[in-house]
Amino acid sequence: MTTSQLQTEQHQVSDDTAISIQNVTISYGSYEAVKNVYCDVPRGKVTAFIGPSGCGKSTVLRALNRMNDLIEGCSLKGRVLFDGVDLYGASVDPVEVRRRIGMVFQQPNPFPKSIYENIAFGARINGFTGDMDELVERSLRQAAVWDECKDKLNESGYSLSGGQQQRLCIARTIAIQPEVILMDEPCSALDPISTLKIEETMHELKKSFTIVIVTHNMQQAVRVSDMTAFYNAEAVEGGSGKVGYLVEFNETEKIFNSPQQQATQDYVSGRFG
C-alpha cells in the first residue's frame, strides 16, 4: 500500500479501529466457509477469535492479511479495511499487506538459518538499513527470547526448543515493524510453561502492536485478550456441511461472564465445542 493509495482509497472508520471487517463472506469454490461477518478490531488491544472447529475463525484471521489468496479457489466478498484502506482493492499489493499485518502460525516455523539471520533476513529484504545488531537484539528482547539466544546467535534456529522457536518466530515478525500481529493458535503445540511465556510476551507486545489471536483454549482467551469474538457454525439449508458465522463480539469479560447470546453462554460454559 503506497501513500497515494492511502490518500485515494480511504473509507471512513473510527480512529480506534485497526481493522474493520465489513459483511465478509469467504468461500472455497462454491462452498461458503464463513458468511456475513462484521467486526471492528480495536487498535492496541488483543482480540481473541474463539469457537468450535469448523466455525471459520482461522479463515477470517487469514483474510486479514490476505493469506487466503494463497489457497486455490478461495474468494472473499465484502470489505476488510485497514486504516480505512480496502485490503482487497485492485491496486493493493498483498505482499505489502503482509508486511504491515504479520502472522505467527500454529507450528513454529523458523527459517533454516542462524538465529541471527532469522531476524535479519526479513528486515534486510524489506529495506532495513539501520543497525542490524541492535534490531536483532531489540526484536529478541521484545519476544522475550533474548536471554536464551544471546550467546548462540550464530547457531541454527532449529537448535531452540519448541517454545523458544515460536518466540523466535514472533521476534522475526516484529523485526519488520508490522502494525498488526495475527496469531493462529500459537500455543497449541507448546507445553504449559512455554505457553505462559508466549502469553506474557503478548501482554508486552500489545503496548506496541494490535494483536488478533485464534485459540481453542478459552482460559487463554480470558487471560490474554481484551475483546473476544465467538464464532459458531450452522448446517447449510438444503445441503451438506456447515457455514461459520460470528455470533457475538464484545469485551472479553462480558463474553465470558454476561454474554448476550445463548449459544455463547453454552460454548463458554462447556456445553458444546
UniProtKB/Swiss-Prot annotation:
It is an enzyme of class 7 (translocase). It comes from the Bacteria. InterPro entries: AAA+_ATPase (IPR003593), ABC_transporter-like_ATP-bd (IPR003439), ABC_transporter-like_CS (IPR017871), P-loop_NTPase (IPR027417), PstB-like (IPR005670). Disulfide bonds: none annotated. Keywords: ATP-binding, Cell inner membrane, Cell membrane, Membrane, Nucleotide-binding, Phosphate transport, Translocase, Transport. The complex is composed of two ATP-binding proteins (PstB), two transmembrane proteins (PstC and PstA) and a solute-binding protein (PstS). This is Phosphate import ATP-binding protein PstB. It comes from Parasynechococcus marenigrum (strain WH8102). The gene is pstB.
